């Protein structure tokens, strides 16, 4: 299973047929094994010559070629390797190839492709083992954070911290640092309140200061002979925590900065994958010389990095960077990947620039893509359990880990994820945040089924169900939200600590400061008794029905053209039902589930003044960015999560005034908020003024 789509679900009969095919092929492989035994009398020179010939043959064919020729090459490569191996090694490799092929077929892949891939994996693993041993000259630095993070933490410290998280006694040692217009918060968990004082941040380094694999250094211009590439201010903030395996929640400044942080995390992922694989291969060689050694270097399954993105266009950018930085030219199924993920089309130029960026290219949000890295090739659409990196959307992964058919559910391939990235979380939040929460519910769990793993080499913290303490989670978003904070605070428990950025917004750079429109803007605060986030929607609704609705019914301003903007769909349903059942207000509504007829009809009626109030949801605005006409006043049930939306809503009034439909001296904007809306308020009014609005003595504040 490499990529999931609407055609990727297979029935049980076909799956069983594939397994029978694999079994028959397994028998055929053993026949080939007997033939291979007869070749053991050949000299080592002949075996090496045969291997070189096989390698040259493979190099003469394009990466995407399929068919019998490729399969015969795979068999030939396998037989050549078998001829040079001892009996135990040969049988072990055959068993592994059979297991991989059966697993792939069970997951829904074509039997012939599954067999071919399994044989190629076996041959390639042997080649990689030799190459990894040839790299023994790459001495791991003493401060290699890969080794420090995963191998040098005592079991006692891990157990103590794990217990502290479970019983709620874990605390954080915190250090704050101001960097221009942003504050960086460094924190590290400790098992008790003792020792919460002390330095947290490790001194900054350049990219060269980290133990990056030599082949990555050479390909990306990071060797001592190359001129040092200057880092951007954003990269300087991210470099150290990223390569020191700390969790990150980062709010980047503009959409044009996305490539900066992606270049870093894709290089980090490649370095992690290469180090993991090379260490396993080198240890394989060590165990052949001394089988009694205890070398713990593995997880339950192979996948080590998970990248979650909102659309195929973003996935294409991420995978393209991984391919560029890998230094590997041979990429299997690259043209198929481009056909399915790349789209040069752009949104209409009339839409806002942020909309054009978010919705450019292929906006499909249903995909899961496996990537397997070897020394000489990258295989796209690889079986999940044979992949090193998985790039997916929340929806695509959701339909695998929470499949309605329990027999088809899979989440074991997430058991050993060590680096996780959530890219463009602000866009993902407009899809379905429940899918993101489900990913965290399934990641780093002990597998339900026994996979092809050597338990004598699985790290103890995997077996002890402590993998979450070692997983690095990096979240990148345009705007930090309460949901983003909750992910970091409740779903992440990295022993190495975490880094969080907070962008300070000056009054001049706030939305109100840059609006350029003299308009009466009223912010009304309501109190949440007890301060519970669970009860906040009820207090907001009560304030709206008792204070705002009577004002609409007895307004001294415009009696039509009132746009009621509601961010949450559950709040929208609640308000709509109340206005319908408890009031006589003539209203209409448009939301993300409205059909085109309803959208067109209600917008026209609102423009003509035949309905007084129009209910409008934030998700609909995010996905469509309508140019609503006839807006004379705006009521925000809650501050928008994206400050650009606030500006766009107010411009509706500006356009009405320009057309002579509204008077700016009469039109008003009213925004309801509580102390829990401070993040959204900061971006609208500025950081200092938001503090006044949320903690000041007054409950009503007005700007013009």
Curated annotation (Swiss-Prot):
Keyword Lipoprotein attributed: no
Keywords of the record: Nucleus, Ribonucleoprotein, Ribosome biogenesis, rRNA processing
Single biological process term from Gene Ontology: maturation of SSU-rRNA from tricistronic rRNA transcript (SSU-rRNA, 5.8S rRNA, LSU-rRNA)
Compartments, as annotated in UniProt: Nucleus, Nucleolus
Acidic residues composition bias: residue spans: 100-113, 125-143
Residue pairs linked by disulfide bridges in the UniProt entry: none
Pfam families noted in UniProt: Utp25_C, UTP25_NTPase-like
UniProt superkingdom: Eukaryota
Primary subcellular site in the record, as a coarse category: nucleus
Basic and acidic residues: bias regions: 30-45
Protein family according to the UniProt entry: Belongs to the UTP25 family.
Biological role: DEAD-box RNA helicase-like protein required for pre-18S rRNA processing, specifically at sites A0, A1, and A2.
Complex and partners: Component of the ribosomal small subunit (SSU) processome composed of at least 40 protein subunits and snoRNA U3.
PANTHER family linked: ORF PROTEIN-RELATED (PTHR12933), U3 SMALL NUCLEOLAR RNA-ASSOCIATED PROTEIN 25 HOMOLOG (PTHR12933:SF0)
Identification of the protein by name: U3 small nucleolar RNA-associated protein 25
Organismal lineage: Eukaryota, Fungi, Dikarya, Ascomycota, Saccharomycotina
């Amino acid at each position: 299973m490499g990529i999931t789509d609407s055609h990727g679900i297979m029935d049980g009969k076909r799956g069983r047929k594939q397994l029978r095919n694999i079994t028959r092929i397994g028998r055929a492989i053993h026949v080939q094994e007997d033939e291979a035994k007869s070749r053991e009398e050949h000299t080592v020179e002949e075996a090496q010559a045969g291997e070189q010939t096989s390698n040259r043959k493979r190099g003469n064919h394009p990466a995407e070629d399929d068919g019998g020729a490729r399969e015969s090459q795979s068999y030939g490569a396998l037989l050549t390797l078998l001829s040079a191996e001892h009996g135990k090694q040969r049988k072990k490799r055959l068993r592994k190839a059979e297991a991989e092929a059966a697993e792939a077929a069970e997951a829904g892949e074509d039997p012939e492709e599954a067999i071919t891939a399994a044989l190629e994996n076996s041959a390639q693993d042997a080649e990689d083992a030799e190459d990894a041993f040839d790299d023994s000259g790459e001495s791991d630095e003493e401060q290699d954070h890969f080794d420090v993070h995963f191998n040098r933490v005592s079991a006692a410290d891990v157990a103590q911290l794990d217990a502290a998280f479970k019983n709620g006694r874990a605390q954080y040692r915190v250090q704050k640092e101001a960097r221009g217009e942003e504050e960086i918060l460094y924190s590290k968990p400790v098992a008790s309140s003792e020792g919460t004082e002390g330095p947290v941040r490790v001194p900054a380094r350049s990219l060269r200061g980290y133990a990056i694999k030599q082949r990555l250094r050479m390909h990306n211009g990071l060797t001592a002979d190359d001129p040092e590439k200057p880092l951007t201010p954003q990269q300087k903030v991210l470099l150290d925590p990223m390569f020191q395996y700390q969790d990150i929640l980062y709010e980047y400044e503009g959409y044009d900065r996305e490539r900066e942080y992606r270049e870093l995390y894709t290089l980090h992922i490649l370095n992690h994958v290469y180090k993991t694989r090379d260490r396993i291969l080198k240890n394989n060689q060590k165990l052949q010389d001394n089988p009694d050694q205890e070398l713990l270097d593995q997880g339950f399954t192979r996948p080590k990095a998970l990248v979650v993105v909102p659309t195929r266009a973003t996935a294409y950018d991420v995978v393209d960077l991984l391919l560029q930085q890998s230094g590997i030219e041979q990429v299997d199924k690259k043209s198929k990947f481009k056909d399915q993920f790349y789209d040069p089309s752009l949104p209409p130029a009339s839409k806002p620039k942020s909309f054009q960026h978010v919705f450019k290219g292929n906006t499909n949000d249903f995909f899961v893509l496996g990537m397997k890295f070897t020394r000489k090739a990258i295989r796209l659409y690889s079986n999940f359990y044979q992949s090193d990196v998985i790039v997916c959307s929340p929806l695509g992964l959701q339909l695998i880990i929470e499949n309605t058919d329990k027999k088809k559910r899979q989440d074991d391939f997430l058991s050993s994820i060590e680096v996780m990235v959530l890219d463009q979380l602000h866009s993902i939040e407009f899809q379905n945040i429940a899918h993101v929460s489900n990913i965290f519910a399934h990641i780093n769990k002990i597998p339900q089924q026994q996979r092809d793993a050597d338990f004598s080499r699985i790290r103890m913290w995997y077996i002890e169900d402590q993998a979450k303490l070692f997983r690095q989670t990096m979240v990148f978003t345009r705007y930090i939200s309460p949901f983003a904070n909750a992910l970091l605070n409740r779903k992440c428990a990295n022993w190495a600590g975490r880094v969080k950025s907070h962008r300070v917004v000056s009054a001049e750079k706030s939305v109100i400061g840059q609006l350029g429109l003299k308009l009466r803007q009223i912010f009304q605060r309501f109190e949440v008794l007890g301060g519970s986030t669970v009860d906040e929607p009820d207090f907001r609704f009560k304030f709206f029905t008792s204070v705002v609705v009577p004002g609409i019914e007895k307004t001294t301003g415009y009696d039509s053209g009132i746009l009621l903007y509601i961010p949450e769909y559950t709040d929208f349903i609640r308000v709509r039902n109340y206005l319908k059942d408890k009031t006589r207000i003539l209203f209409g509504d448009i939301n993300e589930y409205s059909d085109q007829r309803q959208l067109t009809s209600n917008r026209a009626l609102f423009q003509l003044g035949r309905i007084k109030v129009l209910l409008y949801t934030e998700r609909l605005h995010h996905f469509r960015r309508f140019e609503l006409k006839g807006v004379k006043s705006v009521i925000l049930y809650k501050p928008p999560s994206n400050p650009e939306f606030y500006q766009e809503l107010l411009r509706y009034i500006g356009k009405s005034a320009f057309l002579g439909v509204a008077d700016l001296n009469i039109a008003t904007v009213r925004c309801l908020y509580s102390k829990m809306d401070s993040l959204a308020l900061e971006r609208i009014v500025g950081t200092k003024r938001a503090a006044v609005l949320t903690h000041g003595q007054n409950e009503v504040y007005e700007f013009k």
